[in-house]
Amino acid sequence: NLRPHWLPGQGRERDRGPAGHRATEGDFVDFAREYFAWQTGNVYGVRIAGGPDASTLIGTSTLGDFEEARERTHIGWTAYSPEVWGTVVNPEAKLLMLGLAFDHGFGRVKLQADAVNDRSRAAIAKLGATFEGIVRRDQPRADGSWRDAAVYSILATEWPTVRAGLEARLAEHGAEPI
């Protein structure tokens, strides 16, 4: 049973992503319609695959900012229910999305997080992505302050090693749902 994490006071501001929480579910829906790359990306809902909570929506992630001529794309706009933070949900979703990107000929996939969001940065690094640096004053946060973005990437030449690492993490978990 997932709690409504769009409400204020459900976590530290820096763990909320670039937009922060909203006061009501309706406000969150309005935010989501603007925030996610509906027109320029493939937005994926992430659901529980088995067990008593099968089909429960637990998050979202997007493959977007497609630049086919430069063979690069961006995985981002990711948000998961805190109940699944630190589980195999993110590695499994990213394994599928990275595979899709590299199978379709992209040579570089960018991932990024707010520079002060240590949890998200650690999750990206644990995927096997390489830290490239900080883009300063990248985008505004909900509170009006500016976010610096920590930028990471995975190249096509690195993908076999990254894929093997993600598959090993999933194998350690086994077939049981989260």
Q: Which residues does each predicted region cover?
A:
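Acidic active-site catalytic centers that drive phospho-/nucleotidyl reactions
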Residues: 117, 128, 148
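Short Asp/Glu-rich motifs
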Residues: 120, 143-144
